């Protein structure tokens, strides 16, 4: 039996580093938070090769005395708490005394620090072991340089993401910290290029402009509220400025970025049903009595335990509701200025070229895209909330459509209304149709859920829809039959399936027809989004979006695909947002994602079809890759056999 023994200090530091230091972004977070706790008003972060080669954080804080440097790199040595009372009244971002020891255990670290006296101190550590300490010259403050991260833990190094992804994680964490501390001037540079600089003047809206762009900042609303326990201040976007994920929601508690599902839900509740299943851009800064907050529950302190959470949630919801009360919902989603020259951007209406440019690209494209800022995991509660929101919106839309149908056209279309030439379309054989039409490529999608009223044999035949005889139309649904079976067709889902197949086929064959612009459109992005999209320009071109890097977090669009319908600027923004929030990591999956999103946007309303149009829809469904569902998995066709109908009416009992 193995004997119990005490682990060495170096080994315990490496174990602790496994919890605290996960990647280069973790190093940046810990060092910047230390600088904030040292009362710094200016902090500069520089990384080389996405932090994999070197990370440097310099501040003008209080510095460390020469005789305290060794203690600073010892585990559980800190200046921030003294006793148990301090542990439950934490007013600093750090308090465990693990950060520097954990970093030094897995990297080469050099520190240059001064308290403002005549002599500064320089020291170096590697693998948790001190290499040297000497006097040096430096202004007041501290500069810590971390190199060769995980050099002695190759397994950890192996599982890091690509340099691009690791850089985006650093950008994300610096953005969050900057939003939580507008009073501090923060600079982030990568390989000598400045990615972010905040002024440190305490103006939160100016920081939002620096991080997310000026146009976003202009559409942010101030929220304020307080009660005896909490003070709330922040900015939330207008209801018509949304994103596809929660990544643009930042909740800061006593200056610390946290993840809290209930508080995020309270923010969404303040919008009511205005978001349409999407998410706002928001920065909520909450000040609370430290006694109400327990931050000692998670290694990275992103998750906290909060007393009176329900009271705080109500405070947030009411503040957001009040801020949105006077919002003009008729305002446009995005106001983009056309490009005139590189020194002047005038607000002019863009004109479209009358000609359609055929741009065919023979070269195949493959691009790895990773999801970087992982959103909070969706729980059953999240899915339930989103489903309820979508169902309410659909019910409201259906009521309006039914009202329009009653006043504009009969709900039922009888076959007697179909012309003789349409009867030919209805009755021509499957083989004959295949010869006359160009079938679209089969959809190699994932496994889909079966309809509750279809048999296993039906599921095996899912890729083939028989030639149906149209019976009629009611409320946007088609009724048809084949060999005694009744088929119910949701025309919106069916049209979306056909639209999806058509768009995907053109994308996969790289046969995008493009509409050119006389004046390029300017799109501004946050630092995070810009860095991600800049590497996806080849993919955007394959999608039919001719965009070029214009610098300063800006892209120019010269043309767009003709399958993109509706208001161009809005549709392009939504498409780019979908790409940014996607977790897909290969080009083919992203093409399917884009095609599905475009089909959903292009087909959104039920309409009354003529007999010929309804018959043509049924005929085209026979060539669909999966006629029974649209790309999102929503049922398009349901078959009811005579046996199913008998069961519904409980015959035979």
UniProtKB/Swiss-Prot annotation:
GO annotations of cellular component type: mismatch repair complex
GO process terms (BP): mismatch repair
InterPro entries in alphabetical order: DNA_mismatch_repair_CS (IPR014762), DNA_mismatch_repair_MutL (IPR020667), DNA_mismatch_S5_2-like (IPR013507), HATPase_C_sf (IPR036890), MutL/Mlh/PMS (IPR002099), MutL/Mlh/Pms-like (IPR038973), MutL_C (IPR014790), MutL_C_dimsub (IPR042120)
Biased composition (Basic and acidic residues): 375-408
Region entry Disordered, spans: 368-413
UniProt keywords, alphabetically: DNA damage, DNA repair
GO molecular function, one term: ATP hydrolysis activity
NCBIfam families registered for this protein in UniProt: mutl
Role noted for this protein: This protein is involved in the repair of mismatches in DNA. It is required for dam-dependent methyl-directed DNA mismatch repair. May act as a 'molecular matchmaker', a protein that promotes the formation of a stable complex between two or more DNA-binding proteins in an ATP-dependent manner without itself being part of a final effector complex.
PANTHER family reported in the protein's UniProt record: DNA MISMATCH REPAIR PROTEIN MLH, PMS, MUTL, DNA MISMATCH REPAIR PROTEIN MLH1
Family, per entry: Belongs to the DNA mismatch repair MutL/HexB family.
Name of protein: DNA mismatch repair protein MutL
Organism whose genome encodes this protein: Lactobacillus delbrueckii subsp. bulgaricus (strain ATCC 11842 / DSM 20081 / BCRC 10696 / JCM 1002 / NBRC 13953 / NCIMB 11778 / NCTC 12712 / WDCM 00102 / Lb 14)
Lineage of producing organism: Bacteria, Bacillati, Bacillota, Bacilli, Lactobacillales
Gene responsible for this protein: mutL
């Amino acid at each position: 039996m193995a004997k119990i023994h005490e682990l060495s200090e170096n080994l315990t530091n490496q174990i602790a580093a496994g919890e605290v230091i996960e990647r280069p972004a973790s190093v940046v977070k810990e060092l910047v938070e230390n600088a904030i706790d040292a009362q710094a008003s200016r902090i500069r972060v520089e990384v080389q090769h996405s932090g994999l080669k070197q990370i440097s954080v310099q501040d003008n804080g209080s510095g460390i005395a020469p005789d305290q440097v060794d203690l600073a790199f010892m585990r559980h040595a800190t200046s921030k708490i003294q006793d148990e009372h301090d542990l439950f009244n934490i007013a600093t971002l750090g308090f465990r005394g693990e950060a520097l020891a954990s970093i030094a255990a897995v990297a080469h670290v050099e520190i240059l620090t001064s308290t403002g006296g005549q002599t500064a101190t320089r020291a170096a550590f590697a693998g948790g072991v001190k290499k040297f300490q000497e006097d040096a010259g430096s202004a007041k403050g501290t500069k810590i340089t971390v190199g060769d991260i995980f050099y002695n833990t190759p397994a950890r190094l192996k599982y890091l993401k690509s340099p691009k992804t690791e850089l985006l994680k650093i950008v994300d964490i610096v953005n969050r910290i900057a939003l939580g501390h507008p009073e501090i001037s923060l600079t982030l540079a990568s390989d000598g290029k400045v990615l972010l600089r905040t002024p440190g003047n305490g103006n939160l809206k100016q920081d939002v402009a620096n991080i997310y762009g000026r146009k976003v900042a202009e559409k942010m609303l101030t929220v304020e509220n307080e009660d005896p326990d909490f003070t709330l201040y922040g900015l939330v976007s207008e209801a018509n400025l949304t994103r596809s994920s929660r990544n643009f929601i930042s909740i800061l508690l006593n200056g610390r970025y946290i993840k809290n599902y209930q508080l995020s839900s309270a923010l969404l509740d303040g919008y009511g049903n205005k978001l349409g299943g999407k998410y706002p851009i928001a920065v909520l800064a909450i000040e609370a009595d430290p006694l109400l907050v327990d931050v000692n529950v998670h290694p990275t302190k992103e998750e906290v335990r909060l007393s009176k959470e329900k009271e705080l949630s109500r405070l947030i919801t009411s503040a957001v509701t009040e801020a949105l009360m006077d919002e003009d919902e008729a305002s446009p989603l995005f106001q983009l200025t056309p490009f005139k020259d590189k020194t002047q951007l005038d607000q002019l209406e863009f004109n479209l070229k009358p000609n359609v440019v055929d741009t065919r690209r023979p070269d195949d494209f493959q691009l790895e895209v990773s999801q970087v800022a992982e959103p909070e995991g969706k729980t059953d509660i999240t899915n339930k909330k989103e489903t309820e929101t979508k169902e309410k919106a659909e019910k409201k839309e259906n009521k309006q459509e039914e009202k329009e149908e009653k006043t504009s056209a009969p709900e039922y279309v009888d076959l007697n209304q179909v012309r003789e030439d349409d009867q030919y379309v209805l009755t021509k054989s499957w083989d004959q149709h295949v010869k006359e039409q160009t079938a679209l490529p089969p959809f190699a999608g994932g496994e889909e859920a079966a309809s509750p009223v279809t048999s296993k044999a039906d599921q095996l035949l899912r890729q083939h829809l028989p030639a149906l005889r149209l019976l009629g139309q009611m409320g946007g649904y088609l009724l048809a039959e084949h060999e005694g079976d009744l088929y119910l067709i949701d025309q919106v889902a069916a049209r979306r399936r056909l639209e999806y197949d058509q768009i995907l086929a053109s994308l996969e064959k790289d046969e995008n027809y493009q509409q050119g612009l006389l004046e390029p459109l300017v799109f501004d992005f946050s630092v995070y989004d810009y860095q991600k999209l800049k590497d996806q320009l080849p993919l955007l071109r394959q999608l039919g979006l001719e965009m070029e890097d214009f610098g300063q977090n800006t892209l120019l669009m010269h043309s767009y695909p003709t399958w993109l319908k509706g208001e161009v600027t809005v549709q392009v923004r939504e498409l780019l947002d979908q790409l940014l929030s996607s977790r897909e990591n290969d080009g083919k999956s992203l093409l399917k994602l884009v095609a599905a999103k475009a089909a959903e946007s292009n087909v959104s309303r039920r309409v009354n079809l003529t007999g010929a149009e309804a018959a043509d829809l049924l005929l085209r469904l026979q060539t669909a890759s999966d006629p029974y569902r649209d790309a999102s998995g929503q049922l398009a066709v349901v078959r009811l056999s005579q046996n199913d109908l008998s069961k519904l009416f409980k015959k035979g009992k």
